UniProtKB/Swiss-Prot annotation:
Gene (UniProt): panB
Protein's UniProt keywords contain Ribosomal protein: no
Reaction equations catalysed: 3-methyl-2-oxobutanoate + (6R)-5,10-methylene-5,6,7,8-tetrahydrofolate + H2O = 2-dehydropantoate + (6S)-5,6,7,8-tetrahydrofolate
Protein name: 3-methyl-2-oxobutanoate hydroxymethyltransferase
Keyword annotations: Cytoplasm, Magnesium, Metal-binding, Pantothenate biosynthesis, Transferase
MF terms (GO), sorted A to Z: 3-methyl-2-oxobutanoate hydroxymethyltransferase activity; magnesium ion binding
Native organism taxonomy: Bacteria, Bacillati, Bacillota, Bacilli, Bacillales
Species, as recorded: Bacillus velezensis (strain DSM 23117 / BGSC 10A6 / LMG 26770 / FZB42) (Bacillus amyloliquefaciens subsp. plantarum)
GO cellular component: cytoplasm
Residues that coordinate or bind Mg(2+): 43, 82, 114
GO biological process, one term: pantothenate biosynthetic process
Cofactor: Mg(2+)
């Protein structure tokens, strides 16, 4: 399994880091077999798995439950788990308690925290406590209400400078890696030069040290539409629906199960069940 130092070396050597989300055992198993470098158990599971309207309703217990499943499916892959909405904002004590629960109970290798202002101290506290932290700046879904919707961040000079400053502060606070979401490609390239930690992009251009996408977006499963920055490599929903429809049809028409799908009983035993008749 790759470690924090391996990811730094990959950045130094110019080798792209591949991160993908996963939320259960089979997804994680396939991701590891495909050769991803890191798996993110994102709070995006609220929308793509649990059917919620946003990530806000996801709990610490949800993250622990899904990370456990992912860990079983990808024992040799570095796993990052999101700290969900308001689990690291109330107090330092609550932050450490929630983080410890996720790490100890789920087996995650690192935790991801969204935001800059108000979060630097949490990054520092977790790092000092021995928990690796991945920072997330730009479009931060947990704060989408404050940001005014799902919009590209850092498009004007003031907000661009703020993103650069916050990226540097995240590293100074101890973050091992930085995720930039929906940020102009040129700004991503600038931030990449300003920090020594790997920068992972999602809708942040090709100059980042690596990329992350949501599993369901990549394979075309359960999503009605995908963001501009997504490249969809398959559309498995059609295949799945066809298989399920075939099953329904065969049962209704009594085509399934066939004899080869059934178990047989010895005729003598069968006669005994009917009173020897």
């Amino acid at each position: 399994m790759k470690t924090k130092l391996d990811f730094v070396k990959m950045k130094e050597n110019g080798e792209p880091i591949v991160m993908l989300t996963a939320y259960d055992y089979p997804q994680a198993k396939l991701a590891e077999q495909a050769g991803v470098d890191m798996i993110l158990v994102g709070d995006s599971l609220g929308m793509v798995v649990l059917g919620l309207d946003s990530t806000v309703g996801v709990t610490v217990s949800d993250m622990i439950h899904h990370t456990k499943a992912v860990k079983r499916g990808a024992k040799n892959t570095f796993i990052v788990t999101d700290m969900p909405f308001m689990s690291y904002h109330l107090s330092k004590e609550d932050t450490l308690k929630n983080a410890a629960a996720i790490i100890q109970e789920s087996g995650a290798d690192a935790l991801k925290l969204e935001g800059g202002d108000g979060v630097f101290e949490s990054i520092r506290a977790l790092t000092l406590g021995g928990i690796p932290v991945v920072s997330h700046l730009g479009l931060t879904p947990q704060s989408v209400g404050v940001l005014g919707g799902y919009k590209v961040q850092g498009k004007d000079e003031q907000s661009a400078k703020k993103l650069i400053e916050d990226s540097i502060k995240c590293e100074q606070a101890g973050a091992m890696m930085l995720v930039l979401e929906c940020v102009p490609a040129e700004l991503t390239a600038k931030i990449k030069e300003e920090v020594s930690i790997p920068v992972i992009g999602i809708g942040a251009g090709s100059k980042a040290d690596g990329q992350v996408l949501v599993y369901h977006d990549v394979v075309g499963h359960g999503v009605d539409r995908t963001p501009k920055f997504v490249k969809q490599y398959a559309k498995i929903d059609g295949t799945i629906e066809s298989a399920l429809s075939g099953y329904v049809r065969d049962v209704k028409e009594r085509v399934f199960p066939e004899e080869k799908h059934s178990f047989q009983i010895n005729q003598t035993v069968l006669q005994g069940l009917y009173g020897g008749k």
